[in-house]
Amino acid sequence: MNNIRKGDEVIVLTGRDKKRRGTVLARVDADHVLVEGVNVVKKHVKANPMANNPGGIVEKTLPIHISNVALFNPATGKGDRVGVKEVDGRKVRVFRSNGAVVGAKA
């Protein structure tokens, strides 16, 4: 069971975007995630008239390593580790600090 999934709200632990929060847009592979508004770089794109591309400077979101983000716990307002518990015969993700189910409406 994956600790971090698409749609989860995460907080960045290290790097240029430390303490910034965002939503996971995608899992790129087992070790990287795309987070909205995090690790955004400017890329210089050459114009290509054949492809109707004007070129210029484009902002692009790059993947960030999964070890550099933690699931955001709204109850504590901090990043938190995740565990797995069986509730009603189903495996669910729970926050380690308070045992609340991840994604449950409070």
From Swiss-Prot:
Q: Which domain of life is it from?
A: Bacteria
* Any one GO CC term of the record: ribonucleoprotein complex
**Database matches in InterPro entries:** Rib_uL2_dom2, Ribosomal_uL24, Ribosomal_uL24_CS, Ribosomal_uL24_KOW, Translation_prot_SH3-like_sf
Annotated keywords: Ribonucleoprotein, Ribosomal protein, RNA-binding, rRNA-binding
Which GO BP terms, alphabetically? translation
The GO terms describing molecular function are: rRNA binding; structural constituent of ribosome
Q: Which HAMAP family match?
A: Ribosomal_uL24_B
Cite the PANTHER family for this sequence: MITOCHONDRIAL RIBOSOMAL PROTEIN L24
Query: How is this protein organized at the quaternary level?
Result: Part of the 50S ribosomal subunit.
Task: Give the family per the record.
Answer: Belongs to the universal ribosomal protein uL24 family.
Q: State the name under which the record lists this protein.
A: Large ribosomal subunit protein uL24
The gene behind this protein is rplX
